């Protein structure tokens, strides 16, 4: 077999019959499969050993040669080669067809490639191939021209003779009639008898005339058909064709079926055809030109690729290896077989029957029928169901053809090539492991033993516990005591990977150091649950084992959970305390007035109390029970940095140094909390709400190395659990208190609601007004009950503690529990005007229960739909962006995009831009940021972190130019400087990082949180799409629902207000032609926008508009934006619109991820004029290829091509990728492969999918070419100390994670800069 590492591209083409015979190891002549008695393959059948190889290793069919020593011998009795049985997976056979057949992909595909090549309509082609019409293949024009006059004379003679014959017959009949009439008259017959007789005679004469006329017409038809006869002409009338052959057989040839197509192909001159088509394109117009363009695509493909079009008509059919279409015996003695065997058997049966009929010299009509059936059976084999009714097996199930084996989720590509199963893996239920450190996981002993079995066995032999591998295996299987010690030794510092499905982003797989645990459940660290989206209600996780030293190093450095604290989507920490831990820290840092031992100033009768000289003294007091953790006290601190304002007050300009004492007004709990933070971090004297905790961890991640952050969050977790236990926060029915004022509040609002009802019954309000009024009233009522609830609850109520600390839940839920549920929506998303007045504590009435479940069920159904839709969106995003990899350090471009940092308000102060987090943060500066005095605040090429942004704002800079992937000039992929900081590591992105996939995951992962439904904006008006459908609409570049027109030019508006429509005319400033927009529906409403004087009002007559400005409410069409304002604007428009949807749901994704996808949507250029290049007008070309080809042509002083940028939706862009492997594994597999084969496409294997499919290392991360040849070699010391067990003490964090002398890889943040 091929070694995948020795080729860099994969080409696909058309196989001719010659190729098929060369691949083949023999011809399959019989439809037999295996002998049902001996169960051995039949000779010359579909499983024949002579053709495909032996069924048993090193053993021929008849048994004459058995053993490996006869390797390579071909048995003279049975003709089987003695070799391995696995050759039955790779050896092909073939079937020699008695008549050629066309390949259904090229005939039936849309467009029909055969039809375009031969310039035949698909309908006509079908008639020819399936023997419903004859086609003329050649005409001897010269001979016909030379002998035309002779033939015409002959034809005239024949006509004359027909006419003469007719005249003579009529003459004779007329005379006979006269004579008979005379005789009748003589006999004295009556007049009506005579009349009848005459009518009969005239009828016969009429028939004679008609018969002669038909004969003359037929001759005329034959003659005119013959004189106009041309190649590719169809003749449907069988008799006409027979006559033509009889009379003029030497002047032309014709045939039906695939043979005729083959004949036409042989005479087809590709070069001449391409030239004539180019001529038509140059001079033609309209339909003719379009048709020529489409045909030229196919013709040029054959011309350039050197493919022979004969490959579309087959003389032989390949038979795939038998192991790929196996036949297995079931328990009952029956056989289960692959559908392909049935399809092959039909082909062979029909082929053999056809051979026999031809040998017997059967009549044409029978032979043709058999040929048609052969064609249909080959069609069914290649693509069952593409034409006519599919061939069905037992139970009316359509058989799976070769195409079906490739297609869809269960096809070869997605099931077996992109979704392989792996060994060294296991799965089990997860339980929480609060005692673990962040980089550890608990692995069940039995599972670990099975996973590490080979390692344990080798180590047992090394330590002489076992003599050989076999006995070591036996020891492991019997679980002898020594085995556990060895296992403990083997797993030390050998990381494992944990994965939870669905893996929506890269943090769904992380590496951990395993710790052996009893039981059968995997223990998971509580802080990584957020990243895995795991909970402990029965979730399962899979464990994988990295084997090689390189894999272990990558797992440890790149994937260890303590190195993956930040979210790749937003760059903010994901591993932070949640739920109980938040509650615990919140409890710990709460200050309670007048608690035990609180500070009391001195009075006459007592000295000052509640003052402590050190935290230790305060802790002793707490241990004695005279001080509460939450009491306000004064304490002297020496080892903690004071907050900035206190530092300035106590220590002035010199600042605080470790050891300097200062006194804090705080609580013991807060002092204990601050001891968890790293040295030098300013004292935090606040109550720890979840948001405050998040801000602290975020700050730590910006300022300290990852290892410190990991240690800190671990300490916070331990403290959180410890104090949550001691806080006594539990929930019971007694904690749910119904506010006593609830009844009187509701009575008051009931009265108001009754008034509205009466007005409605009197007719003073219509239905909609009544509903709106009731909704308003009940919203107010709900708010007031909520407020009463707030006032009624004590501060230390556990439910309030849980909600206020940010641990979980919100006030709405508390209100539903204890106050009232309030208004609920119906499935359309409208409020039902009757509220649910009861709370869950009191219980709901039947009606309330019903309307409440209504909404809840809608929610569940929505979630299920959303998950599927969001998954599909992620798949399309990954596909379109999978080859965006960081390819170089800097593309040296001068271009960039301008981002706003702040808005200057009239009084001169700056207001920080709301979305600075996702736009400017973590970017590389594209130009020096200079203040008004000309000082450079931040230099070009610097990374914009939080401190830099603060400095820019302090200097009064409102906008900066930053580098962006939208303006990156790297050919394939992007450069590190344009991409900027990697959100997951907080450093400049490494070369080789697969930023495309990270972008797709960052956008797709929160997809399930987006809403499904389209919401109404302002009651009436068109539906404005929102949520997931809107994101899809944008990424697929569809024309939006409720499309709003945009101004094509800058100028003044003339607004005409009609009855149902507006008409807007823009008079351009430059005096050009006026632009008119009419039939603008009034339901859509005019756009509100800011005017020069700062006021906001609706667009009105005489307003001034800028180019690209939206004129109506709704969404602009991105294709219009591209046409009017160009590619840069449409990119920014798409990024902004996508962000709007995510921000509405409170999801933070950095702009750069969306930019990566948008860049891929605008990669192509459509050719308008091909100049001197090879491009065809109207074709889509990659921008990089377009520019390089133009440079080449200009250098050779030719005419460059002209192109226009195109916006493609992500599905279309994925299918238009250069890699046919990637496109085929995405969607429309047969269409992609058909096209690729005709064009003889070559896949350069640049993306990730292609490499996964053929089993190479992906060209990303450490698999990138520049790192390919780095070898890892352990040093002697490392070898010597490979197995020393680290002691798992409590303080497991040492500078390099573990106090062992073992070969631990230090977990500092590796800077890869020196490898550049």
Swiss-Prot record:
Q: Which residues are involved in binding Zn(2+) 2?
A: 891, 968, 975, 978
Q: How is the cofactor bound?
A: Binds 1 Mg(2+) ion per subunit.
Positions annotated to bind Zn(2+) 1: 60, 62, 75, 78
Which GO BP terms sit in this record? DNA-templated transcription
Question: What Pfam families has UniProt attached to this entry?
Answer: RNA_pol_Rpb1_1 (PF04997), RNA_pol_Rpb1_2 (PF00623), RNA_pol_Rpb1_3 (PF04983), RNA_pol_Rpb1_4 (PF05000), RNA_pol_Rpb1_5 (PF04998)
Supply the EC number(s). 2.7.7.6
Cited CDD domains: RNAP_beta'_C, RNAP_beta'_N
- Binding residues for Mg(2+): 535, 537, 539
> What keywords appear on the UniProt entry?
DNA-directed RNA polymerase, Magnesium, Metal-binding, Nucleotidyltransferase, Transcription, Transferase, Zinc
Fetch the HAMAP family from UniProt.
RNApol_bact_RpoC
Name of the protein: DNA-directed RNA polymerase subunit beta'
